[in-house]
């Protein structure tokens, strides 16, 4: 069976790899000149299942109003003329209840934990190297109110069986020694020892090479124009004026997925959340991070690679604007020098931006559609790297008519519609 995968970011490449392992003949098509050259290129570098949380959370609407007035706020909104921006924000607001937050976080943690296990298995089987570390993630709280509010997340972690530690200042210095010098700025932390880090772009590039070894064909520099369909099936994909055909099609185009789905009558609420990162060369390894820290105040992650520090975060709801905002660089530099003033050379840092494909409830869209041979793997938001291996393997199992290893509840596009025309196709029953 031939499968055409659209997109070669970490999600598309992982999909291709696991589909090839399942015995499919796979062709990957992408407009870039290689894998992971857009959103997967310079993300924060975290594989953090326990911190898989939706942006839509209780209290966020009030916080957002406050953030809009702050210089170093984690969120910014630039209104556009695109109606989908307003529709997406309204759907997000509807998910900001305690009940919806708990449901959405459970779905995200379920897929993220599974994905981390798949990554562990892949690394053990293949030895794939990507400057990875398995030293956990530490969420830093600058105020007592932040530490107290973490209790709700801890309750979800306990229900999901995710190990955690609550740290005082001495505990923070134990796991991140370089922070001992700035301990007075912190009141405590939440550490998840099973979280990991790694260079997503490096991982994706090497996974693509492994996929080629399984027979996957990558076609780069290809302009994907539209999907050709009739009835309940996709007939092909128009690429550079040529109709490419296959038995099945996987759409893994991140924020650009809705543009191809709209003519098919499929409304996928995926919208770009613009994020930024700095990549800083390390000058003093002892004063650099050991693994990943999350600054709860600014919603920024600081991650250690071999000889580099990756600082990433923030969210701009601004459409498809890829311009580099110097104020965002200033924020990332401020946070880095505030916590790790002696760790790296900020003057030599590389500044980058990417468009995270976000759903209003935080959970990605992975699974079948009302078109019998069209599958989606998109909408992973800030967690594409965290969820990549699990999403790829989960989708490959569905397409191979195998029983997935985790529950399918709430993961496909049917959760966004009560209409029978968007109901998911028949596939193996949920694992739970």
From Swiss-Prot:
Keyword Cell inner membrane set for record: no
Q: EC no.?
A: 1.4.99.-
Q: Which residues does the record give as FAD binding sites?
A: 3-17
Pathway(s):
Amino-acid degradation; D-alanine degradation; NH(3) and pyruvate from D-alanine: step 1/1
Q: Tell me a Gene Ontology molecular-function term this record carries.
A: D-amino-acid dehydrogenase activity
The alphabetized UniProt keywords are: FAD, Flavoprotein, Oxidoreductase
> Is Flavoprotein tagged as a keyword?
yes
The annotated consequence of gene deletion is: Cells lacking this gene lose the ability to utilize D-alanine, D-histidine, D-phenylalanine, D-serine, D-threonine, and D-valine as the sole source of nitrogen.
Span list, region Disordered: 410-432
| Domain of life of the source | Bacteria
Give the reactions, separated by semicolons, that this protein catalyses.
Answer: a D-alpha-amino acid + A + H2O = a 2-oxocarboxylate + AH2 + NH4(+)
Broad enzyme group: oxidoreductase
Briefly describe its induction: Is highly up-regulated by L- and D-alanine. However, it is likely that intracellular L-Ala is the signal for induction of the dadAX genes through DadR binding to several putative operator sites.
Q: What's the cofactor? A: FAD
The protein's matches in SUPFAM superfamilies, at most eight in alphabetical order, are given as: FAD-linked reductases, C-terminal domain (SSF54373), FAD/NAD(P)-binding domain (SSF51905)
GO CC terms: cytoplasm; plasma membrane
Gene Ontology terms: biological process: D-alanine catabolic process
Q: Which HAMAP family match?
A: DadA
Functionally, this protein is described as follows: Catalyzes the oxidative deamination of D-amino acids. Has very broad substrate specificity; all the D-amino acids tested can be used as the substrate except D-Glu and D-Gln. Participates in the utilization of several D-amino acids as the sole source of nitrogen, i.e. D-alanine, D-histidine, D-phenylalanine, D-serine, D-threonine, and D-valine.
Write out the similarity annotation. Answer: Belongs to the DadA oxidoreductase family.
What is the protein name given in its UniProt record? Answer: D-amino acid dehydrogenase 1
Organism field: Pseudomonas aeruginosa (strain ATCC 15692 / DSM 22644 / CIP 104116 / JCM 14847 / LMG 12228 / 1C / PRS 101 / PAO1)
